[in-house]
Amino acid sequence: VIRRSRLERAEQLGVATVRLAAGQTQRQVAAELGVARSTLQDWRKPEAVGAPPAVLAAWMETPEGVRWLHQLVLAAHFSITLQGAAGIRVVCQFLELSGLSAFVGASYGPQQALNAALEETLVAVAEEQRAALARGMLHRDLTVCEDETFHPQICLVALEPVSGFLLLEQYAADRQAATWTQALKAALVGLDVAVIQGTSDEAGALHRHVEVDLGAHHSPDLFHGQHEVSKATSLSLARQVRQAAATVVAAQQVWAVERAAQQAYEEQSPRPCGRPPAFAARLQAAVSEVVQAEVAHTQAQARQSEARELVRELGILYHPYDLERGQAQPVEQVAQRFNGVWTQLGRIAQAANLPTRARERLAKAQRLTTQLLATITFFFATLQWQIEALALPPDLERALVEQLIPALYLERVAARSTRAEPRHRLRALSHQLLEPLRHGDHPLQALPSAERARLEQVAGECADRFQRSSSGVEGRNGQLALHHQGRHRLSDRKLAALTAVHNYHIRRADGTTAAERFFGRAHETLFGQVLQRMPLPPRPARRRPRPPKPPCLMPLAA
């Protein structure tokens, strides 16, 4: 028995409709199509499900209608289950509410099978695209951001921070250094890359994995240092502000009571016999208490504000280039600024009499200084050998090191700024550094356009080398948490499908996918490739009326 697909059936039904309209009999048309006459009659029988418009129902039986329905159903699965973090039952409900259940089997079983096929196809297409893009890939030195998340199984996640390309996303039995190294090396097979830097938290296994197993530089995540400072100061200082405010209120109430007592005494007529109470001394003491409480409150607020500003200062000073002038910051200058911050925080801790646990947190954050300074040293060292490898004349090399790379770095910092004022100021400073390079008499303008583009690309890679945050992988962990919350379990196939969607489908504002940014080449659309390989959606089953359920207390037959 030959089983025809839904599209083949629609195509043959279209041919049969034309021939029947031309006057041929059903028997003749069935013989020409190679089907039984009863099969042709069944094809032409109207569906007994739903009540869609006749025009729509007829169009759905055409090849164009079948293809459109195929694309629509797959788009629903793709968007709802792989990007919207919802389940298959939401897709079933969408098909019911939209009326598409008249043309597609909307029950859970058929849709679950279709969703499983979609995930398998996604993974296969992503692997093929990765292999195709890797064949023409130029060698790259990578920075890798790494972190673990828990579902509660351990999930290892690693991505390249500039492109956002997920290099690794898989479950593991543990999170030891050897496990990390084995998983990452397997993920990089076939890619012409070398990991020269890893950015992560301060987990010992990640340190060993990056520095010992990979022989790369470990760049600490600045946020973790800032977070330690915030935990050490925010709660205690906020408590002191609240207590000082309560003391001010209590002192003001005492002063008000004393003043009211004085007024009540003076309003008495006649006044009581004897010496009057010492209202002046009591009021003076109450006023003194109010002043002291207000001073203490002001000092507590000042310490709290200063601590917050110092946390921000850690983020402002930790850059290879000065954000005020756009010039390179020597490591000694950055170290001096760090020491100033730690000194001020120590003074606040002493003035506020912070508890021992808070002082230990401050010491823990301060210990990161050595690694932070080492990262700036690493940045300038790699920048130097990468620029020297270009073998440029001294004037061009100076232009790249002192103007182009700092300008591109400031441009990237401005793009990540959340406030308008620093964003506009940094962009203006970047433009100021680039302006001389754009003049026609500058040596850079004498180079061919292809050479200028190559130098700009190298300068951009140098600017991107400084990575002080692993927030990209933290954000990915948050997305995985949403998917896990909706399902309570992510299979290896589901996780691989989610990785494929992230790398080859999701596009930034510039219209590029993570894979295009990572490999430097465009690729065919993921959904288009999947659409060509996926089976057609199942037809709805003919509804059979169910017999009514008899009452539980129906009497038995005699």
Where are these regions (language model features)?
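C-terminal domain-tail junction helix/linker
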Residues: 281, 403-417, 421-432, 438-470, ...
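Active-site proximal helix-loop segment of RNase H-like, two-metal nucleases, encompassing DDE(D)
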Residues: 239-253, 462, 472-490, 505
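Mobile genetic element proteins and their domesticated derivatives, centered on retroelements
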Residues: 15-16, 40-43, 91, 147, ...
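Short alpha-helical "recognition helix" segments of helix-turn-helix
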Residues: 28-33, 91
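Short, amphipathic alpha-helical "recognition" segments used to contact nucleic acids or chromatin
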Residues: 5-24, 70-86
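Key DNA-contact positions within bacterial/archaeal DNA-binding proteins
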Residues: 38-41, 109
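Catalytic-core elements of nucleic-acid end-processing and repair enzymes
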Residues: 293-295, 300-429, 436-443
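RNase H-like nuclease fold core
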Residues: 59-327, 334-344
